[in-house]
Amino acid sequence: MKKYDAIIIGSGIGGLCCGSLLALTGKKVLIFEAHSQPGGVAHSFNMKGYKFESGPSLWSGIGKWPTTNPLGQILKLLDEKVELIKYQGWHVLSLIHI
């Protein structure tokens, strides 16, 4: 039987960050997820030929260091880089005419 230092239920952003930080300190971690893909609500799905992003689309303060964004702090600690796309202003899409 395998032994783990920590067992995490759920592979949302919180579970993945917690597991990553524990693993970084040398802990043996097991993460359980009920769905077919990790990420919790931060994922995408296809329906009727369209792709929908159901997770957050704006990560305020994640691209500059130092940051107060908790995810940005964890990514820095783990030395992980993410590709960022800067917003070029705020746009509102109205679907009332449909």
Regions found by a protein language model. Give the residues of each.
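Anionic group-transfer/hydrolysis microenvironments
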Residues: 7, 35, 55
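Glycine-rich FAD pyrophosphate-binding loop
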Residues: 24-46
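Gly/Ser/Thr-rich beta-alpha loop segments that engage phosphate groups in nucleotides
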Residues: 12, 17, 41-42, 51, ...
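N-terminal FAD cofactor-binding segment of flavoenzymes
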Residues: 52-88
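Core beta-strand elements of the Rossmann-like FAD/NAD(P) dinucleotide-binding domain
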Residues: 2-4
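Short acidic-hydrophobic surface loop/beta-edge motif
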Residues: 43-47, 91-94
